[in-house]
């Protein structure tokens, strides 16, 4: 994780239509290059439309599941409710590796429906989540905007249903 020139991406977040700030992430392309590239390209939208016919882009998608003390999940830009999404490689792609662990707040990891079912859905941790190690690929970490992440957590619930509409209003890659 000490490699130089790791890609950085951002999410601009709105809560109920009100701009609420930006989260910036570094992507661990040195450890999980395929997974990091999927997320980076979904932030930029550079791959055009996917199999679903929808843009391969996180812009204007929502965080559909937020559980305080656990994580915020988003990335379903096809259905919007956790049942959809797709990767830049097709609907899904295989688990790359589980080298990086779910140790800490602000880690980006792939949400999935079992082994080798990575698409576009991801989650951001609020705490250590070691029970996810070996099942979900960690591929990035927040480097700026932790107060925005705290705001997401405040809008979560035990059921996971957010108490507000949390939208990614813009996203992309930051060049140094």
UniProtKB/Swiss-Prot annotation:
It catalyses: [protein]-peptidylproline (omega=180) = [protein]-peptidylproline (omega=0). Its EC number is 5.2.1.8. Residues 10-173 form the PPIase cyclophilin-type domain. One of its GO terms (biological process) is protein folding. PROSITE patterns: CSA_PPIASE_1, CSA_PPIASE_2. GO terms for molecular function: cyclosporin A binding; peptidyl-prolyl cis-trans isomerase activity. Keywords: Isomerase, Rotamase. It is an enzyme of class 5 (isomerase). Pfam families: Pro_isomerase. The keyword GTP-binding does not apply. The keyword Isomerase applies. One of its GO terms (cellular component) is mitochondrion. PANTHER family: PEPTIDYL-PROLYL CIS-TRANS ISOMERASE, PEPTIDYL-PROLYL CIS-TRANS ISOMERASE D-RELATED. Belongs to the cyclophilin-type PPIase family. PPIases accelerate the folding of proteins. It catalyzes the cis-trans isomerization of proline imidic peptide bonds in oligopeptides. This is Peptidyl-prolyl cis-trans isomerase cyp6. It comes from Rhizopus delemar (strain RA 99-880 / ATCC MYA-4621 / FGSC 9543 / NRRL 43880) (Mucormycosis agent). The gene is cyp6.
């Amino acid at each position: 994780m000490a490699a130089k020139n790791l890609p950085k991406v951002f999410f601009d977040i709105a809560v109920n239509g009100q701009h609420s700030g930006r989260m910036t992430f570094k992507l661990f392309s040195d450890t999980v290059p395929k997974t990091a590239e999927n997320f980076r390209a979904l932030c930029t939208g550079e791959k055009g439309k996917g199999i679903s016919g929808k843009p391969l882009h996180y812009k204007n998608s929502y965080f559909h599941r937020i559980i305080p003390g656990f994580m915020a999940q988003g990335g379903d830009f096809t259905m919007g409710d956790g049942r959809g999404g797709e990767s830049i490689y097709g609907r899904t792609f295989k688990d790359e590796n589980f080298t990086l662990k779910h140790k800490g707040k602000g880690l980006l990891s792939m949400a999935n429906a079992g082994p080798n079912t990575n698409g576009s859905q991801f989650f951001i941790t609020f705490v250590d989540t070691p029970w996810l190690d070996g099942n979900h690929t960690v591929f990035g970490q927040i480097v700026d905007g932790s107060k925005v992440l705290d705001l997401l957590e405040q809008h979560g619930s035990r059921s996971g249903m957010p108490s507000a509409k949390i939208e990614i209003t813009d996203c992309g890659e930051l060049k140094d």
